[in-house]
Amino acid sequence: MKKLSNKVVFITGGNSGIGKACALKATAEGANVVIADLASADHEATLKELSALGGEHLFVPIDVGNPDSVKAAVAATVQRFGRLDIALNNAGIGGPYSGIHDMPDAVWQRIIDINLTGVFYCVKHELLQFLKQGGGVIVNMASLAGLKAEHGLAPYTAAKHGVLGLTQNIAVQYGEQHVRANAICPYYIETPLIHQAPEAVRLSWIAATPMKRLGQPDEVAKAFIYLASDDSSYCNGTQLILDGGVMC
């Protein structure tokens, strides 16, 4: 039996990388998937891949840093499918490596706006729908940087710590309303973005893991399915770490 049969799954940043892997895995598990991504994203190829696996799917444009855009994307999802069962708040950006003392204010603010405030905007409108319909599941994509400092990435680290705090607050405040919220904390995952890093840097990331490799998007997607499905029905307010043993 498929784990997400007929569930409506809303995924921000779902057109590439980890988000796309999660969308494909959710579709394979029987879900109807909404890809929420930048309007500039070339989403037709992704929708074709999803359709080949079955179900109904939708692309909605979103800028997670804009509350009106987030509200409209969630509304479009509900208008099409009549409900929202599962939300994966995955959209985010990296940032330049920088000291704190010489970091431009605009760089700090942009990363916080997208990686933390953007998650808040999504959670807010997802919760409004969940409360109307009697429950739902939220999975927030955090990072290992939400659990430990990442040298040179202060705003990213601060934002991901904030995402974990927000996730726990959702769990505490809305558990009685049949809302579950959990987070995934991956280490570096093999995505096109990762391959933009210099080879020496990538090798240093690999050397830091006891497994001597980086994670794969499909491995994150499997974790998402676990947290999204009834397999994790008593899991609430926790973090699932995918790091190959880095935190040991």
Regions found by a protein language model. Give the residues of each.
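Residue(s) in the substrate-gating loop at a strand-loop-helix junction
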Residues: 143
